[in-house]
UniProtKB/Swiss-Prot annotation:
Residues 65-76 have a biased composition (Pro residues). Residues 261-275 have a biased composition (Acidic residues). Pfam families: MA3, MIF4G, W2. This is Eukaryotic translation initiation factor 4 gamma 1. It comes from Oryctolagus cuniculus (Rabbit). Residues 602-621, 918-937 have a biased composition (Polar residues). The keyword Oxidoreductase does not apply. Coiled coil: none annotated. Residues 53-64, 238-251, 359-370, 479-488, 892-913 have a biased composition (Low complexity). Component of the protein complex eIF4F, which is involved in the recognition of the mRNA cap, ATP-dependent unwinding of 5'-terminal secondary structure and recruitment of mRNA to the ribosome. Exists in two complexes, either with EIF1 or with EIF4E (mutually exclusive). Together with EIF1, is required for leaky scanning, in particular for avoiding cap-proximal start codon. Together with EIF4E, antagonizes the scanning promoted by EIF1-EIF4G1 and locates the start codon (through a TISU element) without scanning. InterPro entries: ARM-type_fold, Initiation_fac_eIF4g_MI, MIF4G-like_typ-3, W2_domain. The modification N6-acetyllysine is found at residue 899. eIF4F is a multi-subunit complex, the composition of which varies with external and internal environmental conditions. It is composed of at least EIF4A, EIF4E (cap-binding) and EIF4G1/EIF4G3. Interacts with eIF3 complex, mutually exclusive with EIF4A1 or EIF4A2, EIF4E and through its N-terminus with PABPC1. Interacts with EIF4E or with EIF1 (mutually exclusive) through a common binding site. Interacts through its C-terminus with the serine/threonine kinases MKNK1, and with MKNK2. Appears to act as a scaffold protein, holding these enzymes in place to phosphorylate EIF4E.
Length: 1402
């Protein structure tokens, strides 16, 4: 560093003495105290620790001549041995143990006063940083003082400055004992003595130097200023030489010092002190008397006294004395000296090695004075000290100034200071005063600043080290290197490690090693200790880090994180709430652990937020997931439980009765608004008041609606609802609005026979309020709407427009698409009729009862121009409204104008006309003209009938209608056809039969039977044509939307369950004329009766069975409606535990005669319920009901075989046998000996089995169940079953009389056609089976023709199948083929004529 460092740095805690500092900041005196109880670690010569050596006797020390360099007092460190207070003077030890060090060859250093002598004494190995003391003496001291005065002498100093620095800037707190080492063998060195090795100073201050000669002589003190050493580069480049050990010489002969030794001393001084120190040492104060102010302890031996006396006699050279006197005259002091503090007594040095582990005999034998004796000073010494204090003169410059800077010798320059100069004062003003009452904790409360080196360091070698003042506690500096130890590293006796073979190379480390035996008090924290912290028993933990054990122990924080987590789950469920997800989410709510009163109330608040805050929303209040049966413990009494239902009702009651509280709040806000000072404040309060009123009104409205829904769920009684109505029936508009909402919700359930008087009173009061007109028109209209709703039997004008499920939306989209498709077809049909030209429709068919959009109908009115009132459609088709006997236009009740138009003059009677008017007014007015059939030839009529029927069969669109028409024919089919047929048709038909019989007079009786069969067949065709004339009515009814159909379905079901009129209900369903939407009727029928009585469910099942038997309801529609219920059955099980039993009661009647096959029904149920694991639940309930009605054996024989099909109903991995045994349905296993089982049967054997079943009078359902139970899937899918079933059915239809006849009733398509009849191959297979049967019967005359006619009329075999059989050349089917073709020639001729007529017509 630069030379701008303070000459001395005082240590504030040790500043003492009664002498005040001078104006220039210098300290007049330095107290050097040596205490008898202080433990010394060795004498320090010139800031160096003493060396241990062998024992010497006092006789070995010889007096020597005075030395020009005084010896500074040795410095001792406390903490060493307490007996070593007396100075130990080594004799030959200093010669043998100290004068051994490598000699370096430094560059010569120029000095102003000439080249001084540089002695090369042996450096002392250093254990710690060396304390540096600068002593400036003013006058000699008498020799007698050396022997009598104690060590503790406060000598006045003229320019005496002593500074002691410790490692890391820590100043010791105790005094050190200075010791003076002397030896008679040491010769006095030249005046400008230099140390060969000195420690690196820590602070920018001048340091005292001690010069030791090779010969044993008293130590000399160099009072020249000490500066910072040079860079380490010089030290690295220096070379070491073997040390020179001088021999003992007389005291008067100074030793000869070689130039190498002088250069070595200079180099070592430069390394330790710096170039600035060398410059200052030349300025003055180099040679002073060593005895001017250096006290010598009285306990020193006589040789030391002699040495001191000799030193007094030594005179300083004249040149140096003149320089000193000149400095005393010229130096006026530094202005900054005023800021210097009083130099305290010499502090002790920490971590100094003990003063020799082997004390010398001198130290052991000598008896030092005790501490009280230290205070005994001579009056002479005291006067000298006072005199020195009064006559202190300014010495050399303590600071190094630049040429252009202000300094005491150049006062005219500007006062400019650079950074380095100012940093030299950083530790001068450091005073630390402890606050009172604090405990003494040295590691926390600092007493001294940590003085780190301020010299420029090499950043590459000391990177990352803080060079500023470090106030960090000592325990935090565990990993940092000690930067304050600047002494050379310890090595061998020479004190320095060898640097390679030639002594070259970089240093190993900047940190010196501690000496052997040195005691260090290191305050450190052992990091490996297991420090136990205070741990709370129930410490708070975040919810994410809580373990299951913590939750089980109930370790919850104060804010109730468990309850908060429950509320979050409830809110999460409510956010996902939709009508479709309601049942699933309701199940989740019931699984929540709502076991405390707080949890119950919080869950209730969250659940009621939506219905209370949004009363006008379309979300129904009954879809609020509430665990009605949950119970929880109260807060005050844990043993008492509170029901969730009770909390819910109390909450609703409180909300209903809080009008007074709200009024008080509103009055208070109104008062604040009136008292508002500014208009802005008044406007703000007004908005707040309106908002509060709106919120309160919405909450009350939502509460009213919710109360009504609770009443519907039977959670509130009628008496409570009547009380609510009475309270709301007041004249304020808000209450009346709530009343209207409540009556709209519960009016239907509250208005029954017993409560009618009270309801009349309510509505009379409402009428009175309307008439008074004291309320607003809005409220009056609301009241009037409620009155109209009661008059319409609580049927709203608009249905509940609640939220729809995704499935409902999809269905509505499909229905809309279907309606658009129907409109397109109708437009295309109308366009085709217009393109034909002339009167619409074929001319030959005008006489037939075919009524369509064209023809004689009036011009159709589109839906867009005028809406259709569908409620009037039921009046048209009511029983009795359409009666063919009432449609009379002529006498006799006949529908021909023969008599009236033939000129007979007969007119219809008035009564007949009056009767006919109501009937004709509701029908097509031109239908009477179309009813008249002209008397034509029988052949032409027959051709027309065949042509019309074949044309219908030719198109695919007519196929479903034929199936529906065929299934609609009941047992009274012949009677209805006879009534609908005109007499002219009957006469023409009988005439045809007579002509045919005359043409074939020789034919046997069997042919006459066939003719009668043909007559019946023609009747069937006529009936089919008449029934085909009904589409105009169905077209009008097909326009019914899904919502309208659902409304009508509700009305039909309610009426049927109330009146139990099966015939009326079937007729109403038929009038709906929406076969593609009847699944809505099925769904609503099952859903509406699911929670009613068992009788209601049984009646609903019978109605659906009757609709299936009559053909009004298809199996596909029934399954579709059933599927929608089964999808929700699992969720319904939560609210309806016996839902599977109730579904079984609704489904079981379907499996009766003419309904759905049992096996097919079970398969369809399994498709949807097996994934849910609920198929077995419904199946077992159905089997139990069947056993009650039919018995176990009959159920088993009907085809229920769980032994083979039980895997479809059981869960995966469940044993079927164990399941059957557990559920006690062993009867379903059946008797394996009686049934052939599912094995391959031949055609003959299969036919015999089927004939056996048919002879028992089994129904179609029984036959199908037997097929499914006894045949494998491969046999069912093959033509073997088709031929066997055809053979068995046709054989059972033959009446074995003479001649053979055919029972047409047995040949119905629903018995023969086990599968789809539209497959041509199956139709040909049936004809082959019939051919084989006829061959077996030896070709009875006309039998095959009768079968062909019956099969054609019943639509069992299609026309294509007939042609395929005719043209077949299969060799396996040629037996009896020729005779069969001959017998049916007339049939094929007639069939081709019909097709030719149709082609000509088109």
């Amino acid at each position: 560093m630069s030379g701008a460092r303070t000459v001395s740095t005082p240590t504030p805690p040790q500043t003492g003495g009664g002498v005040e500092p001078q104006a220039n900041g210098e300290t007049p005196q330095v107290a050097v105290i040596v205490r008898s109880d202080d433990r010394s670690q060795g004498a320090i010569i010139g800031g160096r620790p003493g060396l241990p050596g062998p024992e010497h006797s006092p006789s070995e020390s010889q007096p020597s001549s005075p030395s020009p360099t005084p010896s500074p007092p040795p410095i001792l460190e406390p903490g060493s041995e307490p007996n070593l207070a007396v100075l130990s003077l080594p004799g030959d030890t200093m010669t043998s143990g100290m004068i051994q060090m490598p000699v370096e060859e430094p560059a010569p250093i120029s000095r102003e006063a000439g080249e001084p002598y540089c002695l090369s004494p042996e450096p002392t190995p250093l254990a710690e940083p060396i304390l540096e003391v600068e002593v400036t003496l003013s006058k000699p001291v008498p020799v007698s003082e050396f022997s009598s005065s104690p060590i503790q002498v406060l000598t006045p100093l003229a320019s005496h400055k002593m500074e002691i620095h410790e490692p890391n800037g820590v100043v010791p707190s105790e005094d050190l004992e200075p010791e003076v080492e002397s030896s008679p063998e040491l010769a006095p060195p030249p005046p400008p003595a230099c140390l060969s090795e000195s420690p690196v100073p820590i602070a920018p201050t001048t340091q005292p130097e001690e010069l030791l000669n090779g010969a044993p002589s008293p130590p000399a003190v160099d009072l020249s200023p000490v500066c910072e050493p040079e860079d380490q580069a010089k030290e690295d480049t220096a070379s070491a030489t073997p040390p020179a050990v001088p021999s003992a010489t007389p005291a008067t002969a100074p030793p000869a010092t070689s130039p190498a030794q002088e250069e070595e001393g200079e180099e070592e001084e430069e390394e330790e002190e710096g170039e600035a120190g060398a410059a200052e040492s030349d300025k003055g104060g180099e040679d002073l008397h060593p005895t001017e102010s250096t006290p010598v302890p009285g306990h020193l031996p006589q040789n030391v006294e002699a040495v001191a006396a000799t030193q007094v006699a030594v005179s300083v050279p004249k040149r140096r004395r003149k320089i000193k006197e000149l400095n005393k005259k010229e130096a006026v002091g530094d202005l900054l000296d005023a800021f210097k503090e009083v130099n305290p007594a010499v502090p002790e040095v920490e971590n100094q090695p003990p003063a020799g582990n082997n004390p010398t005999p001198e130290s052991e034998g000598s008896s030092g004075p005790s501490r009280p004796e230290e205070a005994d000073e001579t009056w002479d010494a005291k006067e000298d000290k006072i005199h020195n204090a009064e006559n202190i003169q300014p010495g050399e410059q303590k600071y190094e100034y630049k040429s252009d800077q202000w300094r005491p010798l150049n006062l005219e320059e500007k006062k400019r200071y650079d950074r380095e100069f100012l940093l030299g004062f950083q530790f001068i003003f450091c005073q630390y005063a402890e606050a009172g009452g604090l405990p003494h904790i040295s590691d926390v409360v600092l007493e001294k600043a940590n003085k780190t080196p301020l010299r420029p360091l090499d950043p590459s070698r000391l990177s990352g080290i803080n060079c500023g003042p470090d106030f960090t506690p000592s325990f935090a500096n565990l990993g940092r290197p000690a930067l304050s130890s600047r002494g050379p590293p310890r090595g061998g006796p020479g004190g320095e490690l060898p640097r390679g073979a030639a002594g070259l190379g970089p240093r190993r480390s900047l940190q010196p090693r501690p000496p052997k035996g040195a005691r260090k008090l290191i305050a450190s924290v052992i990091m490996t200790e297991d420090i136990k912290l205070n741990k709370a028993e129930k410490a708070w933990k975040p919810s994410s880090k809580r373990t299951a054990a913590d939750k089980d122990r109930g370790e919850e924080d104060a804010d109730g994180s468990k309850t908060q987590d429950l509320f979050r789950r409830v809110r999460s469920i409510l956010n996902k709430l939709t009508p479709q997800m309601f049942q699933q989410l309701m199940k989740q709510v019931t699984q929540l652990a709502i076991d405390t009163e707080g949890a119950s109330k919080g869950s209730l608040t969250s659940s009621l937020r939506r219905p209370f805050q949004n009363p006008t929303s379309q979300w129904p209040s009954q879809h609020v997931p509430l665990p009605h049966g949950a119970e929880s413990a109260t807060t005050e009494k844990p043993t008492v439980t509170v029901n969730f239902r009770k909390l819910l009702l109390n909450r609703c009651q409180k909300e209903f009765e809080k009008d007074k509280d709200d009024d008080e709040v509103f009055e208070k806000k109104q008062k604040e608004m009136d008292e508002a000072a500014t208009a802005e404040e008044r406007e703000r309060l007004k908005e707040e008041l309106e908002e509060a009123r709106d919120i309160a009104r919405r909450c009350s409205l939502g509460n009213i609606k919710f109360i009504g829904e609770l009443f519907k769920l039977k959670m509130l009684t009628e008496a409570i609802m009547h009380d609510c109505v009475v309270k709301l029936l007041r004249h304020d508009e808000e209450s009346l609005e709530f009343l209207c909402r409540l009556l709209t919700t519960i009016g239907k359930d509250l208005d029954f026979e017993k409560a009618k008087p009270r309801m009349d009173q309510y509505f009379n009061q409402m009428e009175k309020i309307i008439k008074e007109k004291k309320t607003s028109s809005r409220i009056r209209f609301m009241l009037q709407d409620v009155l109209d709703l009661r008059q319409s039997n609580w049927v709203p004008r608009r249905g509940d427009q609640g939220p729809k499920t995704i499935d409902q939306i999809h269905k509505e989209a499909e229905m809309e698409e279907h309606r658009e498709h129907i409109k397109v077809q109708q437009l295309m049909a109308k366009g085709s009729d217009k393109r034909r030209g002339g009167p619409p429709g074929p001319p030959i068919s005008r006489g037939l009862p075919l009524v369509d959009d064209g023809g004689w109908n009036t011009v159709p009115i589109s839906k867009g121009s005028r809406p259709i009132d569908t409620s009037r459609l039921t009046k048209i088709t009511k029983p009795g409204s359409i009666d063919s006997n009432n449609q009379l236009f002529a006498p006799g009740g006949r529908l021909s104008w023969g008599k009236g138009s033939s000129g007979s003059g007969a007119k219809p009677s008035d009564a007949a006309s009056e009767v006919s008017r109501p009937a004709t007014s509701t029908l097509n007015r031109f239908s009477a003209l179309q009813q008249a059939v002209p008397t034509e030839s029988t052949d032409n009529r027959r051709v027309v009938q065949r042509s019309s029927l074949s044309r219908e069969r030719g198109g695919k669109a007519g196929e479903p209608r034929r199936r529906l028409e065929r299934s609609e024919r009941g047992g009274d089919r012949g009677d209805r056809l006879d009534r609908a047929r005109t007499p002219a048709t009957k006469r023409s038909f009988s005439k045809e039969v007579e002509e045919r019989s005359r043409e074939r007079p020789s034919q046997p009786e069997g042919l006459r039977k066939a003719a009668s069969l043909t007559e019946d067949r023609d009747r069937g065709r006529d009936a089919a044509k008449r029934e085909a004339a009904l589409p105009p009515v169905s077209c009008a009814k097909a326009a019914l939307s899904e919502e309208e159909l659902e409304k009508k379905s509700k009305a039909i079901i309610e009426e049927y369950l109330h009146l139990n009129d099966m015939k009326e209900a079937v007729q109403c369903v038929q009038e709906l004329a929406s076969p593609s939407l009847l699944f809505i009727f099925v769904r609503h029928g099952i859903e509406s009766t699911l929670e009613r009585s068992a009788i209601a469910r049984e009646r609903m099942g019978q109605l659906l069975h009757q609709l299936l038997c009559a053909g009004h309801l298809s199996t596909a529609q029934y399954y579709q409606g059933l599927y929608e219920i089964l999808e929700l059955a699992e969720d319904m099980e939560i609210d309806i535990p016996h839902v599977w039993l109730y579904l079984a009661e609704l489904v079981t009647p379907i499996m009766q005669e003419g309904g759905v096959p049992m096996g097919e029904l079970f398969r369809e149920i399994t498709k949807h319920l097996r994934p849910l694991g609920k198929a077995a639940s419904l199946l077992l309930e159905i089997l139990r009901l069947l056993c009650k009605s039919k018995g176990p054996k009959k159920v088993a024989y009907c085809g229920v075989r769980l032994g083979s099909a039980g895997k479809n109903f059981c869960l995966e991995g469940q044993d079927v046998g164990a399941f059957i045994t557990e559920q006690k349905v062993e009867y379903t296993l059946g008797e394996e000996s009686e049934a052939p089982g599912q094995r391959a049967l031949s055609s003959e054997e299969l036919s015999r089995q089927l004939e056996k079943v048919l002879k028992e009078g089994s129904s179609n359902q029984r036959v199908f169940d037997w097929i499914e139970a006894n045949l494998s899937e491969q046999q069912i899918a093959s033509n073997t079953l088709v031929r066997a079933l055809m053979t068995a059915v046709c054989y059972s239809a033959i009446i074995f009389e003479t001649p053979l006849r055919v029972d047409v009733a047995v040949l119905k398509g629903d018995r023969i056609c086990y599968r789809n009849t539209c497959v041509i191959a199956e139709g040909a297979a049936r004809l082959y089976a019939l051919q084989a049967l006829v061959v077996t019967l030896e070709q009875p005359a006309n039998l095959l023709r009768m079968f062909f006619d019956a099969l054609y009329d019943e639509d069992v075999v299609k026309e294509e199948a007939f042609y395929s059989w005719e043209s077949s050349k299969d060799p396996a089917e040629q037996q009896g083929k020729g005779v069969a073709l001959k017998s049916v020639t007339a049939f094929f001729k007639w069939l081709r004529e019909v097709e030719e007529e149709e082609s000509d017509h088109n």
